[in-house]
């Protein structure tokens, strides 16, 4: 039986145990991460936490609605059985939520309520020489360029403040102040919980390229990155990801590129030999057709 529970009614220990043991587990569905990125979240729960579905919600003009949080690519239903029907959960969303627009996860498949198919790339990290054989000619060329410029990995001394400050200087046209603040909180909390790492490349005048990855359940999630002009000229981004892939401690992990639906970004991810995966967006609206969010 699927039941709806408000946030205060959720057993968070059972929830996190369910997520950790789910066949489609990811860090976005853990309680600490949901608490960071969601102003409010309730849940649908099958029996005694056999499967769970977070419901991130908010209010606008007095109307309760469900929407995908920022920095949280995939949610949906997390479960142990391969035979689960995601639409059983979607149809159990209380009618008090008059508008729903959220992403499922890859293993949820397509729903009757799907309105969009999204692109993602994942790479199983194995022997480094084997991985490199899957790189595109363009990526190998970028790595040779990085070698010619004698790029080096920076000492791991970046803090959340340093990372956010550097990115803000380079991405003002692409992110809002609210997004910068939330990203900073995620980086800071993840570092404190040992659930994230910052990797950087040293340039002529300090850090020229940096990435932040979330770490959990044998998966790495490429949550954020930035590159300056020097980085782009020297192939630092390719050099940095190749370095991460080479680390022995990550062998057997899955590296999640976090997209992308943008062709240019998708081509870069594909060039590392990553596997194309899909996930769906579901949407429905019980509001007046003239009411828009």
Model-derived features with residue positions:
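Non-catalytic accessory segments adjacent to catalytic cores
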Residues: 84-120
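Short, polar loop motifs at secondary-structure junctions
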Residues: 103-109, 139-141, 261-262
């Amino acid at each position: 039986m699927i039941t709806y529970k408000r946030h205060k009614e959720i057993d968070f220990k059972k929830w996190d145990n369910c997520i950790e043991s789910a066949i489609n587990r990811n860090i976005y569905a853990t309680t600490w991460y949901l608490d960071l990125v969601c102003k409010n979240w309730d849940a649908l729960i099958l029996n005694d936490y056999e499967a769970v579905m977070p419901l991130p919600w908010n209010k606008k003009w007095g109307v309760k609605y469900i929407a995908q949080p920022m920095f949280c690519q995939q949610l949906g239903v997390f479960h142990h059985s391969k035979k689960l029907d995601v639409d059983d959960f979607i149809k159990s969303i209380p009618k008090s939520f008059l508008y729903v627009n959220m992403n499922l996860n890859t293993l949820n498949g397509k729903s009757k309520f799907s309105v969009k198919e999204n692109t993602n790339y994942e790479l199983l990290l194995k022997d480094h020489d084997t991985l490199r054989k899957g790189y595109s000619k363009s990526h190998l060329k970028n790595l040779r360029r990085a070698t010619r410029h004698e790029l080096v990995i920076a000492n791991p001394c970046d803090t959340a403040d340093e990372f956010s400050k550097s990115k803000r200087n380079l991405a003002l046209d692409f992110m809002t102040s609210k997004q910068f603040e939330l990203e900073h909180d995620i980086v800071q909390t993840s570092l404190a919980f040992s659930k994230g790492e910052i990797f950087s490349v040293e340039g002529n005048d300090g850090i020229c390229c940096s990435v932040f990855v979330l770490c959990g359940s044998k998966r790495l999630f490429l949550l954020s990155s930035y590159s300056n002009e020097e980085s782009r000229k020297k192939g630092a981004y390719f050099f940095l990801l190749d370095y991460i892939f080479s680390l022995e401690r990550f062998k057997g992990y899955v590296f999640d590129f976090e997209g992308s639906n943008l062709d240019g970004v998708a081509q870069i991810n594909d060039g590392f030999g990553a596997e194309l995966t899909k996930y769906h967006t579901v949407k429905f609206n019980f509001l007046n057709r003239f009411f828009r969010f």
